[in-house]
Amino acid sequence: MKKLFQNYNYDFTKNEKKLLSSFCKQSLRQMNGDKKFYAETKAFNSILTKLELPDGTIKFTKDEKTRLTYQIKLNVEQIKKQMDKSWFIKKWLMKSLYTQYSNLLEVHFKN
């Protein structure tokens, strides 16, 4: 049976907040000024302001959660592709980033 209501409250650790805020900043830099990505820019700006609050619990809207989850999934897939094509040193450097994003996806954003 499908749940009627989902909880969009998250308790991130300090490292997870840093990772998410750097991810949002990078995404905003890439999408800045393009009118096609107006909704994504608005959602990521809102997420970034919520991540910078000192409060422990962060409450996302459904739109923010779905956009963030989708972008993180795409990022994990892209990192995995780059790791498969690369040599040992690059693979070794990217492995920690891959594990951080995949753990974040598994722990907080698994449907």
Residue spans for each PLM region:
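Positively charged, low-complexity terminal tracts
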Residues: M1-N111
